[in-house]
């Protein structure tokens, strides 16, 4: 019997896959636990519509991330921080601070998890990678000055 999986099932398949299983397994295990539904014409049509919508959504997100990457590429982010002797900062500049400053200076909202940097503890110029989408990233320069 062909079924459409509604959830990931170990050693069977992933959500959204159409697989062939025995009738007993489908009726006695998958259907009662709402892990799968029968792969009839109407359910297949709904599945195809969902997959098309997901594809369009992913394409749109990729385009937006690429546009954002082009917008931020090569920009210089200027931060000022208090520093002691030898240029060591009092405290540190984290990815959260960088994300907040990008929002403030460029009016672009970026999640702190997308800022790929270690904590900055000295004055200077740093190149930081922003991972905007799984395959799209860009680099910006961060200039830390005493202020």
Curated annotation (Swiss-Prot):
Family: Belongs to the bacterial ribosomal protein bL9 family.
Purpose of the protein: Binds to the 23S rRNA.
A Gene Ontology biological process term: translation
Organism for this UniProt entry: Clostridium acetobutylicum (strain ATCC 824 / DSM 792 / JCM 1419 / IAM 19013 / LMG 5710 / NBRC 13948 / NRRL B-527 / VKM B-1787 / 2291 / W)
Disulphide-bridged cysteine pairs: none
Gene: rplI
Keyword flag Transcription regulation: no
Signal peptide bounds: none
Name used for this protein in its record: Large ribosomal subunit protein bL9
GO cellular component annotations of the record: ribonucleoprotein complex; ribosome
InterPro entries, sorted: Ribosomal_bL9 (IPR000244), Ribosomal_bL9/RNase_H1_N (IPR009027), Ribosomal_bL9_bac/chp (IPR020594), Ribosomal_bL9_C (IPR020069), Ribosomal_bL9_C_sf (IPR036791), Ribosomal_bL9_N (IPR020070), Ribosomal_bL9_N_sf (IPR036935)
